[in-house]
Structure formats: structure tokens, C-alpha cells
Amino acid sequence: MKKIYLVFASAITLFLIPFLSHADDHESTSMIKVLLVDGQNNHDWKKCSPVMIDTLQATGRFIVKRAIVAKEEIADFKPDFGQYDVILSNYNGDPWLKETQHSFVQYIKGGGNLVVVHAADNSFPKWKEYNEMIGLGGWKGRNEKDGPYV
């Protein structure tokens, strides 16, 4: 099981290298604000998310806020995505409200960043913009008519 956590930590670090590699950028000393979204997943998010948080915080470059979005809390999940430099998704669950989806699309269109971890590519099979953001949606009834799928 520890190997799985090491793989998750390595994957997160790999995806976030662009944020760490701007040594000449005057903003390189500022903290990178991350919103980690989890709370539903077919993988063990309760163990994986803390490893991601620890890995990011160990660099001294990230401030991580965690949004645990349980089924019964979907209606209350309306974050101000614009407060964050990157959204880290370890979420594979029920669809967000249309209002939250719209807000998220606007965040991405405005230059926001998204890192999708493993099963998070499965989370919204019918949300076209999300599947365009991630480049490849998966599972949950998608097929070749929906575009590329795994």
C-alpha cells in the first residue's frame, strides 16, 4: 500500500513541477494556493488526499485548502475558485450544481489551473466542458459517441 501512496505523491509532484520551475519569476517566492477537492471517489481518497497535502506542504511552496464534498454537501459546494492558483481534483462523485460548474468553467477560461488525479477523470461523464478540460473522460456510461474515452 505504501507503494501506491508513493506513486500518488510522485504523480502530484510531477504535475506541479511547472509551478515550481519559475526560478526567475519575481513571484516565485509567493505561496501557491491550492484547492484540493475530494469527498467522493471509488479509490481511497481518505488516505490518498493527506499524502498529496503532505507532499505539497513539504516543499514550503503551497498553501492547501481541502474541500471535502460529500453527497449530502453538493448543494453547499460553491467555492470561489478564483482564490486559488490551482484546483487539485481527487474527486469522483456526484455532479456539481450547474452554478458551480459554470463558475469552474469561467475559472479555467480565465486562466485557472487544474490537476486531475487518477479517477477524477471519471467524475463528470456528461459535463462536456470538464471532459474538454481534462482531454479524456472515462467510465460511467461514456462511449465513443462522447469523444475519446478510457
Labelled PLM ranges:
Residues V86-N90:
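Structural motif
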Residues M1-I4:
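Positively charged n-region of N-terminal signal peptides that target proteins for export
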Residues F8, D38, Y91:
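Residues that line or immediately flank small-molecule/substrate-binding pockets and catalytic motifs
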Residues D24-Y84:
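Aromatic-Pro/Gly-enriched surface loop or interdomain linker
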Residues V37, D94-V150:
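A glycine-rich, often tryptophan-bearing local segment used as a flexible ligand/cofactor-contacting loop or short
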Residues V7-P18:
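Bacterial N-terminal signal peptides
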Residues V69-E72, N92-W96:
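Short beta->alpha connector loops
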